[in-house]
Amino acid sequence: MYPVRVEINLKTDFTDFTPENFGAYITVNEEGYKKNGTFVKLPSVMDAWGYGGVVVYISLNGYDAYDMACPNCALHGKQTSCAIDGFYAVCPDCGEKYDLASGTAAPQKGLVRETLRRLRIMPSGDKLTITQQQ
């Protein structure tokens, strides 16, 4: 399991990232923070973004967070990060699609049964902290 520790400041960096904005997302990896695909800022020294990067998505349930590594490719020894395409995280290697909008990240093509790895998301004041599940 790869460590995850990401903090999102809703007051300064992501003021419009609210539960009312269904389908909005933030990704975090070594390239930085992106909101809906647009670069926002560099990651801090304290950030750790799991195996394939982190996506925080506003689903029907509110805020959800997942590691973007494709479970199907990981079973075959590949480290492939999914790309966000609307309501789905899509693996560019195997083509599996994971449903983000429902809040389950369940695979849609049936190549694998495993969902994207869910991460813990803790709102506190104006911040969201994302870590791995215990």
Write out the residue ranges for each language-model feature.
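Acidic/polar residues in short coil/turn loops that connect beta-strands
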Residues: 60-61, 94, 102
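N-terminal pre-ligand scaffold of iron-sulfur
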Residues: 1-83, 117-134
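Cys/His/Pro-rich metal-binding microdomains
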Residues: 71, 91-92
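Short secondary-structure subsegments characteristic of cysteine-rich extracellular domains
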Residues: 84-88
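Secreted/processed peptides and extracellular or luminal domains of membrane proteins
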Residues: 76, 97-100
